[in-house]
Amino acid sequence: MMSIKAFTLVSAVERELLMGDKERVNIECVECCGRDLYVGTNDCFVYHFLLEERPVPAGPATFTATKQLQRHLGFKKPVNELRAASALNRLLVLCDNSISLVNMLNLEPVPSGARIKGAATFALNENPVSGDPFCVEVCIISVKRRTIQMFLVYEDRVQIVKEVSTAEQPLAVAVDGHFLCLALTTQYIIHNYSTGVSQDLFPYCSEERPPIVKRIGRQEFLLAGPGGLGMFATVAGISQRAPVHWSENVIGAAVSFPYVIALDDEFITVHSMLDQQQKQTLPFKEGHILQDFEGRVIVATSKGVYILVPLPLEKQIQDLLASRRVEEALVLAKGARRNIPKEKFQVMYRRILQQAGFIQFAQLQFLEAKELFRSGQLDVRELISLYPFLLPTSSSFTRSHPPLHEYADLNQLTQGDQEKMAKCKRFLMSYLNEVRSTEVANGYKEDIDTALLKLYAEADHDSLLDLLVTENFCLLTDSAAWLEKHKKYFALGLLYHYNNQDAAAVQLWVNIVNGDVQDSTRSDLYEYIVDFLTYCLDEELVWAYADWVLQKSEEVGVQVFTKRPLDEQQKNSFNPDDIINCLKKYPKALVKYLEHLVIDKRLQKEEYHTHLAVLYLEEVLLQRASASGKGAEATETQAKLRRLLQKSDLYRVHFLLERLQGAGLPMESAILHGKLGEHEKALHILVHELQDFAAAEDYCLWCSEGRDPPHRQQLFHTLLAIYLHAGPTAHELAVAAVDLLNRHATEFDAAQVLQMLPDTWSVQLLCPFLMGAMRDSIHARRTMQVALGLARSENLIYTYDKMKLKGSSIQLSDKKLCQICQNPFCEPVFVRYPNGGLVHTHCAASRHTNPSSSSPGTRT
């Protein structure tokens, strides 16, 4: 059982004020209506007191009762019950089985003497159905056996409305509209006196203890159930609340939301209707009356009257929070909704959620804390402010007052425990990352992102870079100082870049690469800088660091010029001539850049092609002259040179030929002679100097690429002639000639070749050539025959169509009108359309030159 101080017991009417020194006078009943308190005694007196409430700042209110009047009712029986009908200014008094009407002010009976006789007990209908504001509805348990009666009570008269018979003797009753909640001898029932329908609730033994029936709200009742249970029941016969466990000896009960108050021989117990837990126990002996009057709970012994003063719900909630009883506080706060105006409740409830969130946070219950912070719409800066130095110095934030928690900062909250502090920081990182893109961050995104950056930097978290390369609101001054403090220089560069300070960013990264400052965030930082400059739109910045990146690596550094975005290249923002001039000091980079211009961008400029060829040539010559002789590199560069010489038609051929003289590069010389059309000279070099017969064949192929067949045939005939007019190496050339003929039979004029061949060569030797030549000749002849047949067929179709047109006669008279101009024909000359329409020749000609004019159809 978790206790809470929900009520304070305060004395209202002392014994001396009520009865003086009369020992045998006992209190039988009480009634309270506003400030008016009425007490009925066993000696047939009714006392009227005026209650004055005096609030005390540091504690519960006190009450002072002033006796106004007392009156004897003229009987020798005790006053059993009192009920006030303030609308009528009447007090209903049950004494000696009779209900009398007396004036609430002077306690005089009404002049008419109206009364209800034969009443054992009675109850007022607080949800009346008559609709008459000048009467009250009273339900009595009649002294007649098993009888309930309904009355309308006016200022000076009473009127019976209904009499209901019950299956058992009724012992207690409460009324709501047409519904009676009755405690019979053995059970509780709900009875609708309008329809006569009854519904059993649950059994109850009245011989063991007296029943309790209390109306606690619209269409809901509180009943004393078996086993010491306080049961709730609606007029529908169901329970919408769980029962509360009170003692077996309860003699009275009342409701002061959200609490159920029960009275037994020794104690007053307080249970919550929200979670059914017992919240408070007050010692109170000899009590026999417990009733609630319009929210005021009164208890009484036979000698005195007391008031249970509730502590304000907000004070109760704060007490629970102070005791770290978060769940109970939240349950109580939710239950308080019905008693507090909506707007005020929302403000209060949000604050309670926030306080509860900080309590859970202090206990490292981070999931619960996060949910409470979200539900309570916490200004996240309240949380950030717990962490020293996370809020920017420019932040205008001040903590909520009164404060939401008792902690100055995280050090106090964790008592210096580093592990707890680390957990708290990890939670804040996660929470800020979640809320930064939500409405929670609106208005102070700078504070959130700056705090998040500081946490990431301090924890060396990978998300630091993700934060800086996406949209963020980190304040430059605070963030830069923090990153520098934690030696996050690469991240600082990203921050500069995000704030359009690219020059500062690049310089910082350069310092890292140069070793001036230490930051191991990126092992490929040099490549990152090159990539950054490649996409940088600031030409001055690129030029400022071009030498630096090239000095580090010519092959990588040149990418700042060769890999620029395509849209920027199209704008020609960088002049190639300026770049070439810059790269003269960096030969490898210059070659890469010229390759980019010539091969990648396909710029058709002689200067670039010639320059690249010269650089290739110089590199080849340098490699050949090198003592170490890097064969693989020489071969690669030489292959590039040959490919360029073959593919390009823009370089200066004569200039390169002069550079090649005496260089010992016959293959390159042969390619250049080929570019000049000196094919015989080129082939002579390939055959006689290089003796590379495969290269000679390839030469014929690439030189004739894209040219007409006769040109290719001429090249192959030239090569064959060189083979056949052999010198000392006649045998090798003869073999090469045979191989040439057999491999490329279709490239030769067979008749001309046969005249060139020596008579000593056998047919067997040239069998593949002769077969290929025959096959090519037959294929050409048959292809020509097919084409001729198709042409003849097409001509026949056209001839047939023409004959069809000529086969039908056309009648022409001076009454026939031209379908274009609608004038008659004056001569037998006309144009006929496929649809049969006839037009003048000049109209048809006009229609042909002016297609927009109307026409009867396609002309024939």
From Swiss-Prot:
CHCR repeats: 564-728
Main location: cytoplasm
Domain CNH: 24-297
GO CC aspect terms: CORVET complex; cytoplasm; early endosome; intracellular membrane-bounded organelle; membrane
Pfam families: CNH (PF00780), Vps39_1 (PF10366), zf-Vps39_C (PF10367)
Keywords: Cytoplasm, Endosome, Protein transport, Transport
GO biological process, one term: endosomal vesicle fusion
Oligomeric and partner information: Interacts with TGFBR2 and ACVR2B; in the absence of ligand stimulation. Interacts with TGFBR1, ACVRL1, BMPR1A and ACVR1B; in the absence of ligand stimulation and to a less extent. Interacts with SMAD4; the interaction seems to be mutually exclusive with the interaction of SMAD4 and phosphorylated SMAD2. May interact with ALOX5. Interacts with RAB5C. Interacts with VPS8, VPS11 and VPS16. Component of the putative class C core vacuole/endosome tethering (CORVET) complex; the core of which composed of the class C Vps proteins VPS11, VPS16, VPS18 and VPS33A, is associated with VPS8 and TGFBRAP1.
Annotated function: Plays a role in the TGF-beta/activin signaling pathway. It associates with inactive heteromeric TGF-beta and activin receptor complexes, mainly through the type II receptor, and is released upon activation of signaling. May recruit SMAD4 to the vicinity of the receptor complex and facilitate its interaction with receptor-regulated Smads, such as SMAD2.
Protein name: Transforming growth factor-beta receptor-associated protein 1
Organism annotation: Homo sapiens (Human)
Source organism phylogeny: Eukaryota, Metazoa, Chordata, Craniata, Vertebrata
Gene: TGFBRAP1
